[in-house]
């Protein structure tokens, strides 16, 4: 969830409509752009559902909520944020700092942090080798934004909470799923 145009929320809305056989124009009235929510004159009996792909640290959602979304949905009864994947700590932070009710299909925990002690998918030697590559990709955030250490990639983009080796790009490194360019 972001207040920036062209973010992943639009991609998720399109995929949701196609997956649920709601892409025909007869369903258009059920879906509005976030900027048009204020025109809906929402009341306590109204429910708003926002769609997105991912919550990592929760910072992007909280910033967007504080910047504009809290005003756009003011007066609505319940506001849900439905995401495909959420990191547990990020989801909890969003729910504590906003009025959003977060629903997720897949929740990640500490064992999903590639470099964390709870991650059993890689040996200590493998983690050291991977960390070396991630530091080459991004010295300041080798484990990704918020030090999440995730291995998450979507068809439309790789979150910056994923390890840097996946998405970072510069003159000495090109990630497998670059975020820019």
Locations of regions flagged by a protein language model:
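PRPP-dependent phosphoribosyltransferase catalytic core
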Residues: 4-9, 15, 66-181
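Short, glycine/charge-rich flexible loops or terminal/linker lids adjacent to PRPP-binding catalytic cores
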Residues: 5-47, 52, 56-63
């Amino acid at each position: 969830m972001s207040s920036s145009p062209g973010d992943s929320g639009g991609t998720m809305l399109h995929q949701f409509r196609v997956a649920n056989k709601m892409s025909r124009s007869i369903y258009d009235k059920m879906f509005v752009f976030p900027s048009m929510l204020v025109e809906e004159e929402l009341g306590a009996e109204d429910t708003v559902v926002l769609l997105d792909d991912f919550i990592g640290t929760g910072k992007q959602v909280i910033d967007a909520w504080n910047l504009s979304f809290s005003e756009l949905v003011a007066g609505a009864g319940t506001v849900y944020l439905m995401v495909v994947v959420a990191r547990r700590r990020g989801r909890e932070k969003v729910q504590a700092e906003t009025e959003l009710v977060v629903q997720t299909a897949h929740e990640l925990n500490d064992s999903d942090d590639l470099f964390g002690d709870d991650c059993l998918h890689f040996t200590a030697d493998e983690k050291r080798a991977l960390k070396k590559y991630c530091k080459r990709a991004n010295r300041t955030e080798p484990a990704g934004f918020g030090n999440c250490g995730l291995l998450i990639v979507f068809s439309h983009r790789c979150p910056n909470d994923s390890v840097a080796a996946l998405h970072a790009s510069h003159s000495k490194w090109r990630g497998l799923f670059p975020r820019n360019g």
